[in-house]
């Protein structure tokens, strides 16, 4: 009944009804923002919108209007730079923070047999304090003068330009924190996200006001599951079960769409963010892109598709391109995110439904457990029927504009296996076929990890980039097939990845946001900004693999690699360098 009522309410948003990107004009919807960003005062559009105001919003906007009046609405770049210096403070709103639960030698290190990998894991554990931040008291006193949304607990930032908490990054960061026994820090990060959920009605892309209107893949339930599996903290589940249900309701209320396939109607989720104007943190880039469109095209159409792609986390990729011929060729002007039904979003949501059902059962709420369990079963069924491709032997995104599956390799194709959104009989029947698909694609044969796609478009979420979260998804998906062959393959891919990351870390002393599948350990390229180091989810994924497979992975290939853990530090490091 609920799904029927939701379907009745599905309508197309009229441009005049579009909400602004956020309710803070200075940072989201003002002539001030437009003038400053289009003047290109800073090479990265995110720089300006991360500045704090020295005065309140009204005083800042009034002063800018006076500048426009004085200059006949034609201020010079120097005028704008002077205004920004006078009215904005580029000092960070965050301060460094040392988590009390950080341990120099967490117990999991003892599970890692290979000495080179054990030392690598320890080095990654040592990075956590360098990425730990908390909101400054001055920001808490005047939160309205910053684009940062204050949060109660300290947290781990991804790194580089990403100086705030990010929704889907947090999943792999929290996983890494739990592996290294930083349970209180992980708990605080989850509670920060729940604070954002209650403040906005959903968890935004990140803890900035300019992310207000969009979310990211709904991984809150999966994060809480990780925390519960580590701590068995049933009171935490009891306290926040309503938050899980609130998030599920948000996605059902705002992202649901009905579509036809083979004369049947299916109801699944898509990414769709209809709000006015460019993304503030990429204002210049979005505005310039809109100028390339046909003059009869409403720029808010492309802005919505840009924001929707950003909500997916895959900003940007041919995955969201629909050309005039209906394929995934073209460029950003071909973005059509709203007309793609994503495999991974629906797999994650099916997983969230089932996790919530399981938690309600643990809490002895059988009616709520049955409600969410039934929806999870229906979601898995829709994924199987609408997104499984019998010919290819894998799941594909679905193009609702042209009513056809998008038969291209993307790592997201494996998300149902990752999120256990596959019924056991179906898995038993088709698991081997998925492995065949992967081998036929040749996507597993690169020295630097599994690339996110096989299309070299120049976009950062395409070939040759290998992204840590997607490598995690692929390896875990293959492991979850449950066969001897799949288990062996998962370990092999994990070893390739950890070796590649270790190679890059040895050379550069840094972990990167993304890597080059063609060159083991080299950072990836493309996109709207320069390479970012740190890096939260990259550290988390390596720790995940070493925690899961540390007893068997080796950092070098040699006849006596099995005895590597018995070598001295000096001998082990010499071997690693020689290789």
From Swiss-Prot:
Region annotation Disordered: where it falls in the sequence: 560-579
Catalytic activity of the protein: alpha,alpha-trehalose + H2O = alpha-D-glucose + beta-D-glucose
Pfam families (alphabetical): Trehalase
Tissues of expression: In midgut and Malpighian tubules.
Subcellular location: Basolateral cell membrane
GO CC annotations on file: basolateral plasma membrane
Keywords of the record: Cell membrane, Glycoprotein, Glycosidase, Hydrolase, Membrane, Signal
GO molecular function: alpha,alpha-trehalase activity
Chain positions recorded as substrate binding sites: 161, 168-169, 205, 214-216, 279-281, 313, 528
Predominant location: membrane
Glycosylation: residue positions: 29, 58, 205, 331
Signal sequence, start to end: 1-15
Biased composition (Polar residues): 560-569
Keyword Plastid: no
InterPro entries, per database record: 6-hairpin_glycosidase_sf, 6hp_glycosidase-like_sf, Glyco_hydro_37, Glyco_hydro_37_CS
Active site: 315 (proton donor/acceptor), 513 (proton donor/acceptor)
Enzyme Commission numbers on file: 3.2.1.28
Entry's Gene Ontology BP terms: trehalose catabolic process
Similarity field: Belongs to the glycosyl hydrolase 37 family.
Alphabetical list of PANTHER family matching this protein: TREHALASE
Annotated function: Involved in uptake of hemolymph trehalose into epithelial cells in the midgut of feeding larvae.
Name of protein: Trehalase
Organism the protein comes from: Bombyx mori (Silk moth)
């Amino acid at each position: 009944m609920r799904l029927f009522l939701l379907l009745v309410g599905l309508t197309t948003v009229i441009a005049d009804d579009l909400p602004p990107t956020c309710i803070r004009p200075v940072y989201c919807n003002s002539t001030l923002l437009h003038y400053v960003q289009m003047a290109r005062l800073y090479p990265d559009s995110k720089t300006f919108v991360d500045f704090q105001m020295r005065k309140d919003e009204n005083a800042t906007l009034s002063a800018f209007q006076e500048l426009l009046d004085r200059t006949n609405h034609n201020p010079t770049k120097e005028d704008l730079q002077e205004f920004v210096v006078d009215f904005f403070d580029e000092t960070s709103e965050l301060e460094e923070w040392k988590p009390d639960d950080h341990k120099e030698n967490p117990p999991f290190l003892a599970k890692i047999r290979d000495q080179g990998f054990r030392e690598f894991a320890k080095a990654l554990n040592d990075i956590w304090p360098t990425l730990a931040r908390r909101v400054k008291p001055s920001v808490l006193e005047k939160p309205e003068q910053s684009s940062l949304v204050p949060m109660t607990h300290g947290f781990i930032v991804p790194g580089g330009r990403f100086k705030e908490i990010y929704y889907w990054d947090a999943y792999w960061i929290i996983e890494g924190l739990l592996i290294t026994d930083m349970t209180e820090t992980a708990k605080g990060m989850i509670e920060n996200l729940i604070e954002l959920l209650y403040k906005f009605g959903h968890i935004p892309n990140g803890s900035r006001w300019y992310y207000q209107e969009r979310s990211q893949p709904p991984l809150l339930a999966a994060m809480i599951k990780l925390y519960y599996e580590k701590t068995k903290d049933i009171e935490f589940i009891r306290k926040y079960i309503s938050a899980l249900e609130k998030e599920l309701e948000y996605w059902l209320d705002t992202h649901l769409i009905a579509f036809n396939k083979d004369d049947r109607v299916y109801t699944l989720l898509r990414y769709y963010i209809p709000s006015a104007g460019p993304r503030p943190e990429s204002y210049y880039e979005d505005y310039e892109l809109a100028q390339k469109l046909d003059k009869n095209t409403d720029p808010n159409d492309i802005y919505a598709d840009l924001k929707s792609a950003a909500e997916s986390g895959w900003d940007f990729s041919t995955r969201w391109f629909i050309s005039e011929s209906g394929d995934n060729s073209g460029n950003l002007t071909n973005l059509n995110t709203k007309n793609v039904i994503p495999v991974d979003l629906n797999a994650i949501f099916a997983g969230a439904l089932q996790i919530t059902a399981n938690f309600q059962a643990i809490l002895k709420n059988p009616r709520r457990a049955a409600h969410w369990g039934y929806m999870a079963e229906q979601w898995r069924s829709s994924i199987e029927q609408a997104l499984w491709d019998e010919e290819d032997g894998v799941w594909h995104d679905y193009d609702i504009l042209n009513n056809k599956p998008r038969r291209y390799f993307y790592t997201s194709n494996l998300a149902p296996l990752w999120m256990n959104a596959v019924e056991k009989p179906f898995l038993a029947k088709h698991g081997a076929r998925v492995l065949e698909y992967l081998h036929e694609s040749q996507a597993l044969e690169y020295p630097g990890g599994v690339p996110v796609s096989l299309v070299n478009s120049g976009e950062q979420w395409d070939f040759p980039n290998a992204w840590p979260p997607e490598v995690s998804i692929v390896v875990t998906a293959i492991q979850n097939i449950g066969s001897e062959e799949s288990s062996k393959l998962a370990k092999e891919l994990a070893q390739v990845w950890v070796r590649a990351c270790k190679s890059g870390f040895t050379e550069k002393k840094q972990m990167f946001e993304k890597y080059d599948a063609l060159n083991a350990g080299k950072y990836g390229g493309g996109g709207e900004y320069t390479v970012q180091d740190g890096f939260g989810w990259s550290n988390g994924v390596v720790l995940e693999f070493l925690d899961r497979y540390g007893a068997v992975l080796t950092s070098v290939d040699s006849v006596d690699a099995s005895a590597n853990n018995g070598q001295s530090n000096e001998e082990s490091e010499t071997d690693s360098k020689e290789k």
